[in-house]
Amino acid sequence: MIAKEENKRARLPIDRVSSQDEPAILALNNEHAAELSWLEPERLSFLLGEAFYARRIGALEAFIMTFDQDARYDSPNFLWFRERYPRFVYVDRVVVAGEARGRGHAWRLYEDLFDHVSRAGQTIVTCEVNAEPPNPASDAFHAALGFVEVGDAVIHGGKKAVRYYTRQVAG
């Protein structure tokens, strides 16, 4: 019975983020502000309006937010890719709630994103991973998904170091 329940939870649908999801997304995001960045409600609404792809699993076991090259977004990481690639989809954040970890949600969100990117005629998905402090689990996860490192930077006045990754997707 436990295995069936675990499998059922792992197969929760992937749904588009709606405005009704914003309070829960904001809370989950800000629980992980050290790894991501703190968001205010107005900023989250703006970013979701700019998003190329924003999805959630379940009530909010996990979510992902991405932007294409045309987004009005001032993140130094997004701008790094914009300076180097004419067309791309940038993964801004993927968050999995603590109680939902280990269920494959991040993998499923990325796989669904890759399908969406391909259908949209895009061919490059980009992201960054913190290098300082190091995040070897995220490095390994992105390598397993087929991402390759293409650069690095020190940002926010030297407070943070990141590695930049890309993954080719058949368009």
Residues of each region from the PLM?
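Short amphipathic alpha-helix that is part of the acyltransferase structural core
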Residues: I2-E40, G58-E61
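A short, internal acetyl-CoA/4′-phosphopantetheine-binding micro-motif in the GNAT/acyltransferase core
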Residues: D92-G102, N130-A131
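Conserved acetyl-CoA-binding loop-helix of GNAT-fold acetyltransferases
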Residues: V96, G102-D115, A144
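Conserved active-site alpha-helix within GNAT-family acetyltransferase domains
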Residues: A131-G151
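Conserved acyl-donor/pantetheine-binding loop and adjacent beta-alpha core of acyl/acetyltransferases
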Residues: M65-R93
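Conserved GNAT acetyl-CoA-binding A-motif
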Residues: V117-E132
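Conserved beta-hairpin
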Residues: A51-D68
